[in-house]
């Protein structure tokens, strides 16, 4: 009697048929469960693009849209490669398992030159395509154009933010403003450390000066300063190229607005440390309120180092800036253009802090 005939002669009590029947039932059941879970997950997405973005924000700048499209393209490429690889693994496991009657090794492909070439060249082609599109998007995101229409000074400190308008120059000529405050900047220059008890000159850490030298920081006439009582709101116009000049007054921070799909480290004295401290957005194409964070662990209250970007129309921005130049507080200027005077996107933190006495 052959082994197959012996197997068929086993009674049901030995479990031959139940095992096979169980496997036949479990496979379709597992497939149905997988498809059901996938359907539930995808049903919560408004489109395939949202599903493939895997939680990425939609973005409010042209650079953000390019970055999101690059991410979605990489996800699609990964899914295609994964489907092929896992499909082949499943196919080999399901249809080419060793049988009880097999006595020889299956056909080997160790010296199949065409197959080896395909398996070697294909990954390099995939990497090359992804590398090309990554470089293209990166160049557009890091591009610094001459004469941006709005220049914002961003100063990070433990554990809050200061925003100032260094320069505003709309190309249509409707608003020109120079907001730099050089006198306050000069006041940050420290004096040499002098001589020690032996009459020798003390050499400081910064060009022979003491470490309180902060001449790399920028100061402006119109500023919004965050504090324990105020979550700072940075007001920006739509449709204008905006430059952010970043500096830290103490430790390393990171300026991150998730809807920009971009973040950059904020470093003390960045130029002396050969670090890039400027980036631009081509324009912001969606008005609204957008939360911002520090994305670099910077100490005890790092998690509360939030801010808000409030995007308004160019006309509202001009009215807001005029209010600030007239001496109004940030909250009062926001109220004057019909905006909430306090942050509305910094949940779960108290968004009502910052309601200044004059606007309560």
UniProtKB/Swiss-Prot annotation:
Which cofactors does the annotated protein need, by name?
A: Cu cation; heme
Report the GO molecular function annotations: copper ion binding; cytochrome-c oxidase activity
- Membrane spanning residue stretches: 70-90, 117-137
Disulfide pairs? none
* UniProt catalytic activity: 4 Fe(II)-[cytochrome c] + O2 + 8 H(+)(in) = 4 Fe(III)-[cytochrome c] + 2 H2O + 4 H(+)(out)
What does the function comment of this entry state? Subunits I and II form the functional core of the enzyme complex. Electrons originating in cytochrome c are transferred via heme a and Cu(A) to the binuclear center formed by heme a3 and Cu(B).
Tell me the protein's name.
Answer: Probable cytochrome c oxidase subunit 2
Q: Which organism is it from?
A: Mycolicibacterium paratuberculosis (strain ATCC BAA-968 / K-10) (Mycobacterium paratuberculosis)
